């Protein structure tokens, strides 16, 4: 039975809890009514507070007990955040502070001098090169030791694992920088895409303007010759000629596409 409960706690997507069935409309209405009564009682108790410290402590204890709804209603109230610096969820222990733990806090030897918060990017690069050189050297020593006395391999394996842990920890310190750079790259791609769409719209607008100018060139021709272009309602030969020219221009533009 305990094994089944352990698998249930550490499963990735556990089944819904039993108290889900208590979330009904009737219970929600009861909870609202109970909360109204609690607010009225809190206002009355604040007006009748005593100066004695012991009485205040007793009142606080009573208040904490009274703030829990009775019966099934207590399952409808969100729980208070857990106290301390860590909490348990999905079978694992998590920290409230989203911070990379140091090697010392994990009981591992730190092979570089500076702290994670004060170390600079240039120092990280230098330390990574040193750790890589040490890793290659220890690997060669392990090969030589295996050819002479294979039973003494354990110490070298521990040294190599310690170097790899330090390398992995230094690389993990780059995670915030990697997140910022990834966000910058994403924003740049979005900006480039929007600029490309804007340029495409401007290009289409310029093409439309040029085609409209071609259509209005006939107006400029008549203006240069000091000839007033008659209205479309006029049935004179000049108006008919102008209309025919416009029709030819429109047909030419349509034939291009």
UniProtKB/Swiss-Prot annotation:
Its main location: nucleus. GO terms for biological process: negative regulation of transcription by RNA polymerase II; positive regulation of transcription elongation by RNA polymerase II; positive regulation of transcription initiation by RNA polymerase II; RNA polymerase II preinitiation complex assembly. The keyword Magnesium does not apply. Gene3D superfamilies: 6.10.140.1520, 6.10.140.200. Pfam families: Med7. It is found in: Nucleus. InterPro entries: Med7/Med21-like (IPR037212), Mediatior_Med7 (IPR009244), Mediatior_Med7_sf (IPR044888). This is Mediator of RNA polymerase II transcription subunit 7. It comes from Scheffersomyces stipitis (strain ATCC 58785 / CBS 6054 / NBRC 10063 / NRRL Y-11545).
């Amino acid at each position: 039975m305990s094994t089944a409960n352990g698998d249930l706690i550490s499963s990735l997507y556990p089944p819904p809890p039993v108290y889900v069935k208590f979330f009904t409309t009737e219970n929600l209405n009861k909870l609202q009514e109970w909360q109204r009564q609690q607010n009225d009682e809190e206002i009355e108790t604040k007006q009748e507070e005593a100066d004695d410290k012991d009485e205040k402590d007793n009142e606080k204890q009573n208040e904490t007990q009274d703030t829990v709804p009775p019966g099934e209603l207590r399952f409808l109230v969100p729980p208070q955040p857990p106290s301390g610096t860590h909490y348990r969820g999905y079978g694992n222990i998590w920290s409230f502070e989203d911070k990379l733990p140091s090697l010392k806090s994990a009981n591992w030897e730190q092979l570089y001098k500076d702290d994670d918060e004060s170390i600079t990017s240039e120092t990280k690069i230098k330390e990574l090169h040193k750790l890589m050189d040490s890793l290659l050297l220890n690997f060669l020593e392990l090969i030589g030791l295996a050819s002479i006395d294979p039973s003494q391999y354990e110490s070298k394996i521990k040294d190599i694992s310690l170097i790899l842990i330090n390398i992995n920890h230094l690389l993990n310190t780059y995670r915030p920088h990697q997140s910022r750079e990834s966000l910058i790259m994403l924003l740049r791609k979005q900006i480039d895409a929007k600029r490309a769409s804007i340029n495409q719209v401007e290009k289409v607008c310029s093409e439309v303007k040029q085609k409209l100018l071609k259509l209005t060139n006939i107006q400029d021709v008549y203006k240069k010759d000091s000839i007033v272009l008659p209205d479309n309602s006029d049935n004179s030969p000049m108006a008919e000629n102008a209309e025919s020219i416009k029709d030819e221009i429109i047909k030419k533009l349509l034939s291009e596409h």
